Every structure is written in C-alpha cells, then in structure tokens.
Amino acid sequence: MKASNLFKLIIIGIMFFSTANAGVIYYGFSPGGSAQKLILYSINTSTKSIDIAAYSFTSKDIALALLNAKKRGVEIRVLADYKANEKYTVVGFLRNAGVDVRVNNNYEIMHNKFMVIDNENVQTGSFNYTASANKRNAENVIYIKDNKALASGYQKEFERLFKESE
C-alpha cells in the first residue's frame, strides 16, 4: 500500500473516531436569538448540576433560568470575574438566592464563558452572559452534549479556578 493511501486511511479513521465520540453538537449565533436560546435550553434541560464560568454576567433571563434549575434540584455553582461583582450584574442576585458564587481576582481578567452541565455536556463560545451579547454583539455559542471526555476537561479547569476564588 502506498504511503499516501495509508495516510488517507489514517486521516479517515481519525475523523470517524473523533466524530463518533463528539456527542451531539448544537450551535447558535447572535444577534438573532439563537445563541441565548441555546444557552437557556442547556440550562432548562439540566438534571444534576451546572458549573458556570462567566467573565461578564448581567443577563436576567439566564439568571432566572439558573434559579429555576436550582428549584428543580440542580446544583448550581457560579465562578465570575472579579469585575462581575460590581453593580448591574446578577452575581449578587444569585448569591442572595442561595447559589454558590465565587469571584476570581487572580488574573487581569478571568475571561472564560462556559458551562459544564450534568458532567457530560459543555456550553462555550464567545457569548458573555449579557443582554448586549444577545442583542447587540456578534457572538457564538456551541453546546456539546454527551461528551464526557470534553466535560471532564472543562470540569477540571472549573474546579481549579473555583478553588482559587473567593
């Protein structure tokens, strides 16, 4: 077998293996609403836990969805950049509602925007959890379901950041 044909077979195998284990992938964009709708869907369909790392968090809709998930028995933890502790954010609102919230001030900015949901799903992208991201900015969201390996990697990073935060 020629080396080029072997290389093609290896590439096809890698692509198939990667796709077969990727889980189900959804995506959305803003403006237009599909990004925020996907975030709300990921929260509303959670059953066990949501760990959210947020650079900027002012979206009332997302905060209310998290509180509704908490009422359903979903464990919620929020990790926010230290600037998110200022007024006009929902960090204080969530903390006052009993959500485990920590603020990270170990970096110039903690610029993450991701959720680990039920230890097997990941939502990430450029979308800050804000009204501006939904209505005024060009943003993206990707939601990967049923990918425990990916979720595990994001979970480890969340735990590292959460432990070093106040």
Residue spans of the language-model regions?
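Bacterial N-terminal signal peptides
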Residues: 9-18
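Solvent-exposed loop/turn segments at secondary-structure junctions
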Residues: 56-60, 82-86, 106-109, 121-122, ...
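A general structural motif
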Residues: 30-35, 59
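Primarily the HKD phosphodiesterase
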Residues: 41-99
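Bacterial N-terminal signal peptides that target proteins for export
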Residues: 1-10
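Boundary at the C-terminal end of the N-terminal hydrophobic targeting segment
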Residues: 20-24
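Structural recognition of the beta-strand scaffold that forms the well-ordered cores
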Residues: 51-53, 77-80, 102-103, 115-116, ...
